[in-house]
Amino acid sequence: MQNQVESLSLMPREKLLRFGAPALTDEELLAIFLRTGIKGCSVMQLSRHVLQHFHSLRGLMSATQTEFCQLKGLGITQFIQLQACTEMSKRYLQEELKLTQAFKNSENVRFYLQATLENKEREIFQVLFLDNQHRLIKQEEMFLGTINCTTIHPREIIKSALFCNAAALILAHNHPSGNPEPSASDKMVTTKIQAAAELVEIRILDHFVIGKGCYYSFAENRLL
């Protein structure tokens, strides 16, 4: 109780040093990033206003340069810094996948795929190639555009898998509409890839469909 009361009286930087970053609210984390407020507006007030404008950290971090810089108190310097922080986070998650048994940390896989795919304007079909201990060998964007049976070629996926000696695959693609519910075509493509993979004893561990702040897992829904 004493620590809780004490944390309320601390500025964000001091609070982070005392209790660690997870103890901070979104507003406090953003205030540290912004560093200073503007005339007539403290940094905490500015942080609160920014989050209200973009609705969430996700909304802020996915904003375009124009959307970001049109808000009073934000400029090109902060936009560049935010893009750098976002990219470092993505690369950190990718390194985590390489250092861990990927499927035993499926939440990390999902977070990484959401970070890399959910704000894309076109559909992108990615494949994570894993070894027999489910560690990441490589990640590859295989196909761009509308995902259907005419644009996705299972043989190309299997060819890449055999070339890098992959034992298992995780499939993923995004829905720019924001709705992750798989289409009939998504299901058919997944079935064809799974059938082709089984012929060479490669497992399909999951197929993630990434929407806006949400996802659909074929494995979790027992479609694999």
From Swiss-Prot:
Keywords, alphabetical: Hydrolase, Metal-binding, Metalloprotease, Protease, Zinc
InterPro entries linked: MPN (IPR037518), RadC_JAB (IPR025657), RuvA_2-like (IPR010994), UPF0758 (IPR001405), UPF0758_CS (IPR020891), UPF0758_N (IPR046778)
One annotated GO biological process: proteolysis
Keyword Protease in annotation: yes
Pfam families per record: RadC, UPF0758_N
All residue ranges annotated as the MPN domain in the record: 102-224
GO MF entries: metal ion binding; metallopeptidase activity
Cell division listed as a keyword: no
Amino acids binding Zn(2+): H173, H175, D186
UniProt superkingdom: Bacteria
Motif interval(s): JAMM motif: 173-186
NCBIfam families found in the cross-reference section: PRK00024.1, radc
Family from the record: Belongs to the UPF0758 family.
Protein name per its UniProtKB record: UPF0758 protein PM1152
